[in-house]
Amino acid sequence: VQTRAHDRSDFVTRWPALLARIATAAEAGAKLIVVPEGTVPAYVIGSDPVDPQQIEAAAADVIAVAARTGATIVYGRARAAERGLANSAYVVTPSGIAGYADKCFLWHFDRRWFSAGDALEPVDTPAGRLGVFICADGRIPTIASTLVEKGAEVLVVPTAWVSSGRDPRALENLQADLMIAVRARENGVPLVAANKAGVEARSVAYCGKSQILAADGSVVALAGQDEETTLTGTVAIGPPLVRLGAEPPPVQRLAGDPLPAVLRVAIAAHADPALRASALVADAELVLDPHERPSSSDVALVDDEAMLDPRALVAPRLDGVRLFVWRCSIDAAWAVPFARTRAAELRAYVVAFDTPQRRAFAVDPDGVVICGTFGAFELAAFTFERARTETWRVAPATDVRDALVRVGKITSRAVAP
């Protein structure tokens, strides 16, 4: 259910209509209904205390709908926790509240009124075993993979994907536009994400784009950016299409001196001495091709198995790798999404050599493809900037390195025997 954003002050008047949308979806036969993050009472909480009676009254309404219709409903709400409020997603079945998930990776102003979650556990429901995570948790690859490792059959994402509004006609969000499909495909399970549309508190713009994805990452249903709507779709529930090993596949870290602060790098899709000679045209100080192994401890070589495993690049990146070189032979439609996702979630450069397509391309730490070869254009170049790999902050007070380390501790507990 993609809802129209509301201010906290408007919750009481908006809630009957929101509840009616949930009930209508359930009465139409939906077995699993997902409602956005921060629906009750809102995402932008502010400094005023939350009324627990208001929160519990809304919960009772949702419980009644689930009991009457037989649906499983996942919705975003504030939860009173030991350390203050938690940004939670509650899972409600016909039998009542089955469980909840707290947001682990707080984003930007979340920290002002929420405390971070510290557990990752699937929730059993009549609709399947659900791996629930919230919004920015989707930027940390090991959150979804831990839930699937613990038996989740569907990934469920109540979210509040925001946009800067750079182009009001095409609102952007890296998760909605890129990462969330990779999360489904790399874990091999369906994924359902519900976002808001519109503006909250005159200062938070949502990009819509709620979506239902199949286990291979393909789109079953996708909402637009502006409308309040209910998406419907059918996905297959069963064992994951992907089976991750007990341990992440190895990544080959190279030896040598660190890369300089600024380095011009040329990339070629195939080894050719003549192309290497042409590197002078690009002012390149380093030329990479599928067989070149640069002598630097900042660089690691990655094969398909490691690139597709959401866990494999995390430890090397935390240990100081800044440039991943990938010899790629996967489906061409997924090469760029995986390279972009890994670069953005780990704040690193990725150079990919797509052997079947005879193409090389590079991605920067923001997940942007910054150069690539094609056709007769056989040598492309980019500038490696070490400082960009040292900046882990992706929003105010939102540090990816801190989150990776913190979630690593949570996942270690979660998978411990």
Q: In which residue ranges do the predicted regions lie?
A:
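Residue-level recognition of beta-strand->loop/alpha-helix junctions
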Residues: 2-4, 36, 102, 195, ...
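Active-site catalytic loop in hydrolytic enzyme cores
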Residues: 80-154, 158-159, 163-178, 236-256, ...
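C-terminal beta-strand edge segments of enzyme domains
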Residues: 113-114, 122, 183, 190-263, ...
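Cys-nucleophile CN-hydrolase/nitrilase-fold catalytic domain and related Cys-dependent amidase chemistry
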Residues: 8-97, 161-189, 266, 270-301, ...
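CN hydrolase (nitrilase-like) catalytic-core segments centered on the catalytic cysteine
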Residues: 55-74, 139-228, 286, 309-378
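Short beta->alpha transition motifs characteristic of CBS
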Residues: 41, 47, 90, 101-107, ...
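Active-site beta-loop-alpha junctions enriched in small/polar residues
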Residues: 3-6, 78-80, 103-104, 135, ...
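Short beta-strand segments enriched in small/hydrophobic residues
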Residues: 1-5, 256-272
